[in-house]
A protein has these predicted regions:
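A conserved FAD-binding loop/helix module that cradles the flavin
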Residues: 183, 311-345
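Mid-to-C-terminal Rossmann-like scaffold of FAD/NAD(P)H-dependent oxidoreductases
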Residues: 214-218, 227-235, 247-250, 337-406, ...
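Iron-sulfur cluster-binding cysteine motifs and their immediate structural context
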Residues: 1-20, 67, 74, 104-106, ...
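Rossmann-like dinucleotide-binding cores of NAD(P)H-dependent redox enzymes
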Residues: 65-108, 184-231, 344-359
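Glycine-rich dinucleotide-binding loop and its adjacent helix/turn
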Residues: 21-37, 95-110, 115, 136-190, ...
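N-terminal Rossmann-like FAD-binding beta1-loop-alpha1 element of flavoenzymes
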Residues: 42-67, 180-188
């Protein structure tokens, strides 16, 4: 679900930025979790990305001995090798991993696992595969194996591991996902004079984070939309990409059609390919596959081999860090149950929030705009890899947090306060096809006759309601509020 603030203000809540603010405070306020009793069970986790580390930490908190195996010299997976330092400083990642180690997780680096049987023979009671999706997808065009052509993940990996490959003054990037944008911005920081990104669709269809795209453009990255490479050629030792203009079309439809006679050429010293990524499952893992990903049981994340589980990118294909963390937690639940536990992994380091009284007067104004997120000036960014997004001040963080509609709280219905003004239905109808048609609204007002024989109202919500709170915001009589109120109906 997307933040509902975007429905009624200029922008959604800056959730990611607020999470970072809280995390920055927490770095100096670490708390110990509950004491755990060892179960005597051992779990091997293959891959030290967000899914693997999350599963290992969570299983350790359940009392299982967790060991993480990482093929590279440093742990972190895609967080370490695929996300540039200007977005995720390696020292922050290292501090988080140290916290995981202190919870009892053992991390073995530079140790590639090629055989599942080896792990099971070593006495591990369960194995979790969190292999990620680190292999770039090929384009299938002539010349993509030419010297000077590299996939984005390999390029970012070399940079993040300290090898800093020189891309030259003129760089071309194919694709506009997050990896493509990261590679383009990284090339600028390594001295490229001109970086040109070629994408076969429009900006509205881009899969990359819109904020990252905007920052790339502000830094000087050029994006050529509605264009696709047809082949890569080398002439007189110079690399060039021959492209064709494409016709607009639906992102979910077949690849856009090329326009005859629209050829143009982009010359570059390095061409970075970022058209997709996929997992690489070792031959020594005799598992059932679905295409190029590992097949698992949806409810248990179990693979076709007993005792072996898999999750995140190697099962679903490329996803976000937060989705990988969620997969790691789900895997920990499944593995804990497999090992005889309850699967109850919830842990609170703070007391539960007390029941809240109805919220009405503190709702943000419909004109409340998003607070400006401080960014490092472009000239300073391009001198290296400093963090681009600067931390919020405590005052700004509080102002931004106060924009929240509190969608986590139920909508409290006080039918006795309803005056049949229909404002709730009118504003609700704006969210759906048929604006100002109250029959299209997700909130329903039903006339009834009460026990005293007087006309009354019953307020209900249909399945379209996603709790956006528009009705609460605009109800002038207090019939709809947020919070908990004894004796009232809640939705």
């Amino acid at each position: 679900m997307k933040c509902q603030l975007a429905q009624v203000t200029d922008a959604p809540e800056a959730i990611r930025t607020l999470k970072r603010f809280v995390a920055d405070q927490a770095l100096s306020e670490r708390r110990n979790g509950r004491e755990v009793t060892p179960t005597g069970k051992r779990v091997a986790i293959v891959g030290s990305g967000p899914a693997g580390l999350t599963a290992a930490y969570t299983l350790a908190r359940q009392g299982h001995r967790s060991t993480v195996f990482e093929a590279l010299p440093e742990p972190g997976g895609m967080m370490r090798t695929g996300i540039p330092a200007y977005r995720l400083p390696p020292e922050i990642l290292a501090a988080e991993i140290e916290e995981i180690k202190r919870a009892g997780v053992e991390v073995k680096t530079a140790e590639r696992i090629e055989s599942l049987d080896r792990l099971l023979a070593e006495g591990y009671d369960a194995v979790f595969l969190a292999l990620g999706a680190h292999r770039g997808v090929r384009m299938g065009i002539d010349g993509e194996d030419s010297p000077g052509v590299i996939d984005a993940l390999s390029y970012l990996r070399r940079v993040n591991m300290g090898k800093c490959p020189t891309a030259g003054k003129y760089v071309a990037v194919i694709g506009v996902g997050n990896a493509a944008v990261d590679a383009a911005r990284t090339a600028l920081r390594l001295g490229a004079k001109e970086v040109t990104v070629v994408y076969r669709r429009t900006r509205a269809e881009m899969r990359a984070n819109p904020e990252e795209v905007s920052e790339a453009l502000s830094e000087g990255v050029k994006i050529v939309f509605l264009a696709a490479p047809s082949r890569i050629v080398t002439k007189d030792g110079r690399l060039a990409m021959e492209c064709l203009r494409t016709m607009p079309g639906s992102r979910d439809a077949a690849p856009p059609k090329s326009i005859e006679g629209s050829e143009f050429t982009v010359e570059a010293e390095t061409i970075i390919v970022a058209v997709g990524q996929e997992p690489e499952v070792p031959a020594g893992f005799p598992l059932s596959l679905t295409g190029r990903t590992i097949a698992t049981a949806p409810d248990s994340m179990a693979t076709s081999k007993a005792g072996v589980f898999a999750g995140a990118d190697c099962v679903t294909g490329p996803s976000s860090v937060i989705e990988a963390i969620a997969a790691g937690r789900q895997a920990a639940i499944a593995i804990d149950r497999y090992l005889g536990g309850s699967g109850a992994i919830e842990e609170r380091l703070a007391p539960p929030e007390e029941a809240m009284t109805p919220v009405k007067e503190n709702y943000p104004s419909p004109t409340a705009i998003r607070n400006q997120i401080p960014l490092l000036p472009v000239a300073e960014r391009l001198k290296g890899f400093p963090l681009v997004e600067l931390p919020l001040s405590p005052e700004t963080a509080v102002r931004e947090a106060n924009r929240c509609l509190r969608c986590d709280l139920p909508i409290v219905v006080e039918e006795a306060n309803c005056r049949w003004c229909f404002v709730c239905q009118l504003v609700c109808s704006l969210r759906f096809e048929g604006a100002f048609d109250t029959s299209k609204a997700a909130i329903k007002l039903l006339p009834v006759v009460n026990a005293a024989g007087n006309r009354d109202v019953r307020i209900s919500f249909d399945d379209k309601c996603d709790g956006c709170g528009l009705c609460v915001r605009y109800c002038p009589y207090g019939a709809l509020t947020r919070g908990s109120s004894a004796g009232s109906n809640e939705h």
